[in-house]
Regions:
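Extended, highly charged
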Residues: 1-170, 175-185, 189-203
């Protein structure tokens, strides 16, 4: 944390995550699992959300319920992204986001960290990337302006809207059934398609 590093931005033509794009969004065609019978439906549980708003970037884990072909309902716990969304909504604004699946493990590690201040987790991931691989972490800009790891397997971009909807029930990492809450809705505007998820026991998340 004392020695963050700046990622480098690469062109879309040099970004593996842009090797394939789809013309129309239908998240129902993506292999998003229905983990447990008690769950509300299909959930993306190992994706990270990268949000950018007012010059601040946040990278963090948040589960997302697949509501329909281009909407997710995201469980936001009271940390930095929740604060970012609350502040934006207070001004009547949506928040630009990208849902990222299967980036390099250093990005997953940085996203799992919690800080007491607004630290850009991608600068932590970039420092780890340089330490491990001897080269900078590459980012690419999505059509909505959000920068994501260029080598991620799957990226969806869109907006956290002003709408809330039911999220849950969901079998959480503790094995208990989480409550139903009103949570923000993400509208997905595009995606670049290999999807990654935590299996039922959530071992990966538990180890983080």
């Amino acid at each position: 944390m004392d020695n963050p590093s700046e990622p480098v931005v690469v062109d879309q033509n040099d970004a593996p995550c842009f090797e394939h794009t789809v013309e129309s969004v239908d998240l129902r065609t993506i292999p998003i699992p229905h983990h447990w019978p008690q769950d509300r439906g299909r959930y993306s549980s190992a994706s990270i959300i990268i949000a950018q708003d007012n010059g601040i970037r946040n990278v963090s884990f948040h589960r997302q319920f697949l509501r329909d072909e281009n909407h997710l309902v995201v469980r936001l716990v009271p940390r930095h992204l929740r604060t970012m969304v609350t502040n934006a909504r207070g001004e009547g604004r949506e928040v630009s986001v990208a849902v990222v699946n299967a980036p390099d493990p250093v990005v997953l590690l940085a996203a799992a960290m919690s800080f007491n201040e607004n630290i850009d987790e991608l600068t932590i991931a970039a420092a780890l990337h340089e330490k491990l691989y001897g080269r900078p972490l590459g980012l690419v800009e999505m059509p909505n302006g959000v920068h994501v790891p260029a080598d991620a397997e799957y990226v969806w971009w869109g907006r956290i809207t002003l709408e809330d909807d039911d999220e849950g029930p969901y079998v959480d990492i503790t094995g208990t059934v989480d409550d139903v809450r009103k949570e923000p809705v993400i509208e997905i505007d595009g995606l670049t398609p290999v999807s990654y998820t935590h299996l039922r026991a959530h071992e990966t998340l538990g180890n983080l």
